[in-house]
């Protein structure tokens, strides 16, 4: 039995495509701007905007994203299969002061929306950790054996200690090395975990 940590944005959701879709609409309609760096991790990098314009975008769309973003195909199905033999930990910065939500909703409302979204999308788990802390510390404290992550900084840091499944995105293409296993779909993740 393993303890498997799973991130939300970029792993359970396709935040990369969502930011490209909604960001290009918002910045084009409002400012006539276009995508500057499709490999950016944050919307601010994708559209090369300052914090003020980035906050403006998220203030407009964060609630919509949080409540209605779709899960990646087969995420709930594969997580249920993994849960049969493992403990599932959802580990997210959402519901913390690091989240884009700070100008839109309270931390507690954000946590409630996350919990409702997980339930609505039938994502079953054993524990959820809302934390702005370094995810490596969270993994160590909770004895996580494997992390499924998309953020380059987290992938590179966590993989120094435990295996990380890198959910492929344009912004994390440069992540590779010992303990990093690139996957492209939830059933690809399932296959990789079964082989470990």
Which sequence ranges carry the predicted segments?
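Short, flexible active-site-adjacent loop segments at beta-strand->alpha-helix junctions, enriched
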Residues: 16-18, 94-95, 170
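Flexible, glycine-rich phosphate/dinucleotide-binding loops
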Residues: 21, 97, 173
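C-terminal cap/substrate-recognition subdomain and adjoining C-terminal extension
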Residues: 103-146, 151-196
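Active-site neighborhood of HAD-like aspartate-dependent phosphohydrolases
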Residues: 1-53
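Substrate-recognition element of Asp-dependent hydrolases with the DxDx(T/V) motif
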Residues: 66, 75-111, 131
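Short hydrophobic segments within beta-strands
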Residues: 7, 91-93, 148, 167
